[in-house]
């Protein structure tokens, strides 16, 4: 009888143990590394002070234990959890070093099911959770698959106004007079491509988000490869599309076209076939605050980047993405990060603003039956809330330490617009977002957070039932 029960248990084990591959990405400086570090830290400390009341399995005391286990794919770098934790608990505390490529960490979550049928056969189940971190810049490359070289060139050069126009001056000067039909000059093309890469790096340093091709700023082991030595044709209209289309692969324009096609076919498709195809759930982190600080060009650039990124999540049967990869993602969460960098009364506005930015995608996802949500969170809470008296008026404020020099600050950053800001908002410039470093924290206690448990409930809660 005991042997029969053991065999039945083993059979049920195979039936109820679950595997979930969660992808984490975000626009530049959105806090991906801090998010994953904090999420893992909370789960590993469910019996040591973790605050996760919104995760139903914890609230109902059904999550029995969590441990790290070896990842299945030995070819993917390990996520630097321990290193990130050491930085957060350091003296002085620091934000974790951002990751620059794909990395992964794997957890086993042991839980009691509240499913009556499963409970009848088995006391506990296990969820194997694989958390995969990858750069948002790579996701932003996906729309290139729906373009040819000349249409992509038009889009890129069409952005070169305002500050982008200033920052691209060297590239435009170097590409001046380049003959599309002349025999390919590889050295000159490499030099001009380097100038385009410098321009993209400058855009990223200045807080812009729409950067293509994404691998140019995060090349990894592809640094110096000809696949990363192309750039948009600078003056499509001057030469005319028909003439440029005639350029064979041994000409300047032809070689750039060939490299663009190779990049799309091998690099972009390769990433999505090897990684994205295997994701079950996806969270996209967005920092809405820094662009509000930087001005209308930075904010509109973030909006453009999100619009492009959303093209990656159009799940309709007829879309390019569906035809190529048949993705299985069934839940998509957008999170406005750094909720601790604004006062509590502005949290709802943060979420509302992000909802406005992704409204079209939300409608598409709902139509396709994809479960999608939007929330505000702070992976690691860096400030405390309080009330200050200003000329007899009590207003909410934040206390923390400034990121640049650690100086203590008490500030009211201002109001976050609940809708896409118009010219009146920019004219007033009443919002002043300050970057904070992490608080000094007790190494024996889990990291403080805001609504990280709400994100966990949406992303994995149904798998722990």
From Swiss-Prot:
Catalytic activity: GTP + H2O = GDP + phosphate + H(+)
Molecular function as annotated in GO: GDP binding; GTP binding; GTPase activity
Known cofactor(s): Mg(2+)
Keyword Ligase belongs to the record: no
UniProt: GDP binding residues: 31-34, 95, 99, 338, 340-341, 380
Positions bound to GTP: 28, 31-34, 95, 99-100, 338, 340-341, 380
Modified residues (N6-acetyllysine): 249
Keyword annotations of the record: Acetylation, GTP-binding, Hydrolase, Nucleotide-binding
E.C. code: 3.6.5.2
Motif Walker A motif location, chain numbering: 26-33
Activity: how regulated: Alternates between an inactive form bound to GDP and an active form bound to GTP. Likely activated by a guanine nucleotide-exchange factor (GEF).
Listed Pfam families: DUF463
InterPro entries recorded: YcjX-like
Enzyme class: hydrolase
Family recorded in the similarity comment: To H.influenzae HI_1637.
Oligomer and partners: Monomer in solution.
Purpose: Binds GTP and GDP. Has intrinsic GTPase activity. Does not hydrolyze ATP. May act as a transducer of stress responses.
Protein name (Swiss-Prot/TrEMBL): Ras-like GTPase YcjX
The species this protein was found in: Escherichia coli (strain K12)
Gene: ycjX
């Amino acid at each position: 009888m005991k042997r029969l029960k053991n065999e039945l248990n083993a059979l049920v084990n195979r039936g109820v143990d679950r595997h979930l591959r969660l992808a984490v990405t975000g626009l530049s400086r959105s806090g991906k590394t801090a998010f994953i570090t904090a999420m893992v830290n909370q789960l590993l400390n469910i019996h040591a002070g973790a605050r996760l009341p919104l995760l139903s399995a914890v609230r109902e005391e059904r999550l029995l234990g969590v441990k790290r286990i070896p990842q299945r794919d030995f070819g993917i770098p390990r996520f630097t959890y321990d290193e990130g934790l050491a930085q957060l608990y350091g003296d002085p505390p620091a934000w974790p070093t951002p990751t620059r490529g794909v990395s992964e960490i794997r957890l086993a979550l042991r839980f009691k099911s509240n499913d009556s049928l499963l409970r009848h056969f088995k006391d506990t189940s296990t969820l194997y959770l694989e958390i995969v971190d990858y750069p948002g810049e790579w996701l932003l490359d996906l729309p290139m698959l729906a373009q040819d070289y000349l249409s992509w060139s038009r889009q890129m050069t069409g952005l070169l106004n305002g500050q982008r126009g200033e920052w691209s001056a060297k590239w435009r000067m170097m590409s001046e007079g380049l003959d599309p039909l002349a025999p390919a000059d590889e050295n000159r093309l490499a030099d001009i491509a380097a100038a385009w890469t410098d321009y993209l790096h400058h855009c990223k340093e200045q807080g812009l988000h729409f950067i293509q091709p994404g691998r140019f700023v995060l090349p990894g082991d592809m640094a110096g490869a000809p696949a990363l030595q192309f750039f948009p044709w600078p003056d499509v209209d001057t030469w005319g599309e028909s003439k440029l289309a005639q350029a064979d692969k041994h000409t300047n324009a032809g070689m750039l076209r060939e490299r663009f096609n190779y990049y799309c076919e091998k690099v972009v498709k390769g990433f999505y076939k090897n990684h994205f195809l295997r994701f079950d759930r996806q969270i996209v982190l967005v920092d809405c605050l820094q662009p509000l600080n930087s001005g209308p060009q930075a904010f509109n650039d973030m909006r453009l980047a999100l619009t492009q990124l959303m093209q990656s999540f159009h799940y309709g049967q007829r879309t390019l993405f569906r035809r190529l990869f048949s993705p299985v993602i069934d839940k998509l969460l957008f999170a406005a990060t750094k909720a601790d960098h604004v006062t509590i009364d502005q949290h709802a506005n943060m979420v509302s603003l992000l909802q406005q930015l992704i409204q079209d995608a939300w409608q598409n996802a709902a139509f396709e039956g994809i479960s999608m949500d939007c929330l505000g969170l702070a992976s690691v809470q860096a400030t405390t809330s309080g009330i200050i008296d200003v000329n007899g008026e009590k207003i909410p404020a934040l206390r923390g330490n400034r990121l640049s020099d650690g100086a203590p600050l008490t500030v009211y950053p201002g109001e976050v617009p609940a809708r896409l800001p118009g010219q009146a908002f920019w004219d007033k410039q009443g919002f002043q977002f300050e970057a904070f470093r992490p608080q000094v924290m007790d190494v024996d206690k889990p990291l403080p957070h805001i609504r990280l448990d709400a994100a966990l409930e949406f992303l994995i809660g149904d798998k722990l039932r």
